[in-house]
Amino acid sequence: MRKLSYVEFLVSKTRQRLVLLFLLLIPIAAFSQKGTFRTLMQIQGTGLTKEFKPYELCCDLGYNITDNLYADLRYENAIALFKENGVKDYAHSHIVGLNLGYVVYHSENCNIGAQIGYGSNMKRKNSDWKYDYYEAMAFTDLGTCKIKPRFGLGVRHYNSRTNHYKDRTVIFASIGFGINW
């Protein structure tokens, strides 16, 4: 058997400690979860620039990890309107994404929070524009019932994977409704 060098020894010990820590944290995470599901439907877009106007119809299916923390899987049906050098064009895309959000302020009638997200059309053949997006959004949920309207404002960066369209960053607004199960 080969003798480990000092660095290899430290790496193996660190791995062992991380695995042990992970195994100890699993019960804490499992029993501290709120364990409810959530659905969100929203429309988001921007009309601030004449050169680029993206609009997305979003459907999120998620899980409330705690009262404040949630994770969502997102599907978007997106259309982007372009006007470059006087030529108008559009691109239609289907996007799959993941969001992670945190509610900062809880009250009976209002929740205020923030979420970050990433999405990609994963090189789908039926998408005109191939891109990844990164977004950050502040939102408010209003009302006391299970179905709550949501209003949001955020920033999104489109990382284009084609030569036909360039990378873009926009400020967007969203409106929709959410259901907590």
Task: Write out the residue ranges for each language-model feature.
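Compositionally biased, intrinsically disordered low-complexity segments enriched
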Residues: Y6-E8, L18, G35, Q44-T46, ...
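A generic hydrophobic-segment detector
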Residues: Y131-W181
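Transmembrane beta-barrel outer-membrane domains
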Residues: K34, K50-P54, D89-I95, S127-Y133, ...
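Bacterial Sec-dependent N-terminal signal peptides
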Residues: M1-F37, W181
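Short glycine/proline- and aromatic-enriched beta-strand/turn motifs that initiate or cap beta-hairpins
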Residues: A30-I79, K83, V170, S174, ...
